[in-house]
Design a protein with these regions (language model features):
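Conserved beta-alpha junction segments in alpha/beta enzyme cores
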Residues: 44-57, 185-221
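Conserved, well-ordered active-site substructure
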Residues: 113-137, 198-219, 223-256, 265-313
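A short, polar/proline- and glycine-enriched secondary-structure boundary/capping micro-motif
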Residues: 81-86, 162-172, 235-241
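Short, solvent-exposed aromatic-acidic interface loops
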Residues: 75-82, 157-163, 228-233
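Zymogen propeptides
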Residues: 1-136, 141-142, 146, 150-152
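Histidine-centered catalytic micro-motifs
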Residues: 262
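Structural recognition of the beta-strand scaffold that forms the well-ordered cores
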Residues: 101-105, 142-144, 216, 224-227, ...
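Active-site-adjacent helix-turn-beta-strand microarchitecture at beta-sheet edges
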Residues: 105-208
């Protein structure tokens, strides 16, 4: 596409140069941000733009998975029953953990809370280091992070359904165990909402524009795209539909994509590389890349149930 240019970094990451500010991250990641453009055209960034076109603000982090590690972050509530986690914020997580370079909100949850450390209920599977915090929701999808091999995006109910279908077959205990393995034995898994990119083809609802968070994987599983889109702010960013997010992921190189929790929960924090030469100051200091769209305090992250965090290997 002609809306942006690509170039390779010595680190093995890829930088996309939009008509807007950009900052290189450390450890195999690239941070790009821009605003403006025609939503219906996909990746169209412009510092000017025609005023009658919807405006978008978005940030993408392109990850070379040979150089970075993906880490699910969720904190079980002490003494709580299964299905509860303590709320946390991406920016505060980066501030407290200097080895990490990026963190995005992940699993949907209830209820909304206004401060960190409050019990919330993830909606869908969350598994961290083999400990399951919550159960799968069959209609939603999940990002699996296996100990070996590339990450995968699958339906949360697929493994359970396969296991149930084989339950009446004598001698198929091994098959049932294998079918159950992704959900039951996954070392790390973060549930999201829907698959919005399948085989490089966008899918999902076209109607509602909102703030969005999403992840996409390349066909060979070697690259991940993390995307955050600001929304619900006319004149600054109207957000994207689910299908539009799928198209953006495809344009950025993804083959399969997962929609994460969005709306007021959408938040992506990054840490600049100390040797970054873009912008003024702030090297190594975590910062938010999009302005969260929720009350009571606009611009402050909503505490969420889980994060997908990134650190160099």
């Amino acid at each position: 596409m002609s809306y942006f240019s690509r170039s390779s970094l010595a680190s093995g990451a890829q930088i996309l140069e939009f008509k807007g500010p950009e900052t290189q991250l450390s450890g195999g990641a690239t941070y790009v941000t821009g605003s403006g453009g025609n939503v219906s055209m996909g990746l169209t960034f412009s510092t000017g733009g025609r005023r009658h076109l919807p405006r978008i603000q978005a940030t993408a982090v392109i990850l070379d998975l040979a150089m970075v590690e993906l880490v699910p972050v969720a904190r079980p509530a002490p003494g709580a029953s299964e299905g509860e986690a303590l709320s946390l914020r991406p920016l505060l997580f980066l501030e407290a953990n200097p080895e990490y370079i990026a963190a995005i909100n992940a699993t949907p949850f209830e209820p909304n809370v206004v401060s960190v450390g409050k019990p919330v209920n993830p909606i869908g599977i969350v598994t961290v280091e083999g400990r399951g915090l919550s159960e799968p929701v069959g209609r939603y999808a999940v990002l699996y992070l296996p100990e070996s091999g590339p990450p995968r995006i699958e339906m949360q109910g697929a493994a359970r359904s396969a296991a149930e279908e084989g339950a009446g077959s004598d001698g198929d205990a091994r098959s049932r165990r294998e079918a159950e393995e992704p959900a039951a034995r996954a070392e790390n898994a973060l549930g999201g909402y829907f698959i919005i990119l399948e085989g490089g083809k966008p899918q999902g609802p076209r109607e509602l524009r909102s703030a969005r968070s999403a992840v996409g994987l390349s066909e060979d599983g070697r690259k991940m795209i993390i995307l955050a889109v600001a929304g619900d702010s006319p004149g600054k960013s109207v957000g994207l539909t689910a299908r539009e997010v799928g198209r953006w992921l495809a344009e950025l190189g993804a083959y399969r994509g997962l929609l994460l929790d969005g709306g007021g929960s959408s938040s992506l924090a990054v840490r600049r590389s100390p040797d970054a030469h873009f912008g003024s100051g702030g090297a190594g200091i975590p910062r938010m890349t999009i302005k969260p769209s929720w009350g009571p305090t606009l611009g402050v992250e909503r505490p969420v149930a889980s994060l997908l965090a990134v650190r160099p290997k």
